[in-house]
Amino acid sequence: MNHFPKLLSSQIGFDVAQSMLEYFDRHYRIFREAAVEAKALFERADWHGLQRLARERITSYDERVQECVEVLQDEYDAESIDDEVWQQIKLHYIGLLTSHRQPECAETFFNSVCCKILHRSYFNNDFIFVRPAISTEYLENDEPAAKPTYRAYYPGTDGLAVTLERIVTNFQLEPPFEDLARDIACVMQAIHDEFGRFDEAPNFQIHVLSSLFFRNKSAYIVGRIINADRVLPFAVPIRHVRPGLLALDTVLLRRDLLQIIFSFSHSYFLVDMDVPSAYVDFLCTIMPGKPKAEIYTSVGLQKQGKNLFYRDLLHHLSHSSDRFIVAPGIKGLVMLVFTLPSFPYVFKIIKDHFPPPKETTRRQIMEKYLLVKRHDRLGRMADTLEYSSVALPLARLDHALVRELEKEVPSLLEYEGDNLVIKHLYIERRMTPLNLYLQNGTDAEVEHGVKEYGNAVKELMKANIFPGDMLYKNFGVTRHGRVVFYDYDEIEYLTDCNVRRVPPPRNEEDELSGEPWYTVGPHDIFPETYGPFLLGDPRVRAAFLKHHADFFDPALWQASKDKLLQGELPDFFPYDASLRFCVRYPERFRATDERAPARGAQRAA
């Protein structure tokens, strides 16, 4: 039954709707300005500036929401507006969105503002956008001077080499390329290596998204090759090879490789999108099966991703019958974790009390999760979705889980009819706990898991992250086989840690003691002491000493800390180094290096 008013007679309703849309437009203008600035920072190789920009953009949305809430309360006494006017506000807002180019994001912004003002009993489709109201299908900017979502190129006309060069140069990056002809030849060789020689169908064409995707020290060209009924995805990272010179680093031609660079464990891209739904639809064609929620999140629209995820959860609950259960595995000291077996995510709640030796607070743990949200995750830390007042049907909660919730988090529970409302929780992608992966894996899987674990910790170290608790249970293995850290309550900046060697024992009593014979400060870390906790399994030990024998040497950790203190930002690649053109086709680089020996020496370094 439709409860909406027949007439839109409230001037306040229209004014409130217009004010809300103005604040959304301000938010999205800032969002796009950040992407434009990212291009300038990339061209100048200002990596610290790019990091700062990415951090600031994450908080921008909440700042605009709060500004909007304050204006509505001050100017319209929003909390006193009656139900009929609130319904008119939504209808007026829908009317304002009919020709908008980001309607889905504007609807999410409306929800964010309303959830700050209205009681949760209003969180239904009469008052907020539980379901979308404006279609984004075939949405484009039709203005003559507008940049299209993607450009189409036809290699059959000018040849593949000329077409690829045009694709790159159309982005009009300011620094020149070291040797673009060489890089184009590498792209063509990689395509041949991957697909062999294929016959060009009449519809042979290349589609390329019109904006670059910026993250870390790379700018990605993203597109697809169309040939007959085949859709072949690709991404080309552009990097600085030395001051003032660019190069194409590789071409990624497999869906699994693109899914990794767009994964939940990486920081968000900075990309300029006039019509974000069109970009997301394009990306869905090259990564089918990847949820739209994750794609919106990966391109920096994390609130839209969060909204879509919640809709996906509600849809899944209405089309499934299994129950939420306590997550299998070793229980954590600070988090209660549960899951729905048919849904590939875990739900994490901070406990009311923490047993010794944990010395922390709810506020401190929330700050750690916020630190990770704002930090460069490098594909090694899981992103989290944070929710408040989540209502779950009691009939879908396992009795053992309800008992566990009532025992561990009673302050966060509220019974409301047939639902249990959880006042605060985090949601993450479900992964295989690394301890179980190593325990149950084949010899090859154990070696892979250990190698990945060492790589993950070393990369986090270089990114100024000390995990704190190094146990395998705090790491997970993704469906792509990457090891990712996901337990953040003890996380610290490496530069805040004091890397120490274990002092030699003073006597035999010290040597036999089960307790440290030396003082340990709150920020002291002793890499030499990690061995007994990590190397108990003979298979794990053999793999660890094969791939990461230096892991327990304090010098490794101190060297990373020293470089960070000197302001150095190391290079990170979300793909295997063997895929880089300079590694894969070294003979093509020799001619360039022979013409400029200093370049070759710099690349080798």
Curated annotation (Swiss-Prot):
From the Swiss-Prot or TrEMBL record, state where the protein is found. Cytoplasm
- EC number(s) from the headed UniProt entry: 2.7.11.5, 3.1.3.-
- Active-site residues (renumbered): 383
Catalytic reaction(s) noted: L-seryl-[isocitrate dehydrogenase] + ATP = O-phospho-L-seryl-[isocitrate dehydrogenase] + ADP + H(+)
* Listed InterPro entries: AceK_kinase, AceK_regulatory, Isocitrate_DH_AceK
Q: Which GO terms describe its molecular function?
A: [isocitrate dehydrogenase (NADP+)] kinase activity; AMP binding; ATP binding; phosphoprotein phosphatase activity; protein serine/threonine kinase activity
Q: Which UniProt keywords apply?
A: ATP-binding, Cytoplasm, Glyoxylate bypass, Hydrolase, Kinase, Nucleotide-binding, Protein phosphatase, Serine/threonine-protein kinase, Transferase, Tricarboxylic acid cycle
What is the protein's known function?
Bifunctional enzyme which can phosphorylate or dephosphorylate isocitrate dehydrogenase (IDH) on a specific serine residue. This is a regulatory mechanism which enables bacteria to bypass the Krebs cycle via the glyoxylate shunt in response to the source of carbon. When bacteria are grown on glucose, IDH is fully active and unphosphorylated, but when grown on acetate or ethanol, the activity of IDH declines drastically concomitant with its phosphorylation.
> Does the record bear Nucleus in its keywords?
no
Question: Which Pfam families is this protein grouped with?
Answer: AceK_kinase (PF06315), AceK_regulatory (PF20423)
* Name of the protein described by the UniProt record: Isocitrate dehydrogenase kinase/phosphatase
UniProt-listed HAMAP family: AceK
Give the family per the record.
Answer: Belongs to the AceK family.
Write out the transmembrane intervals.
none
Sites binding ATP sit at 327-333, 348
What biological-process terms (Gene Ontology) are attached? Answer: glucose metabolic process; glyoxylate cycle; tricarboxylic acid cycle
Single GO cellular component term: cytoplasm
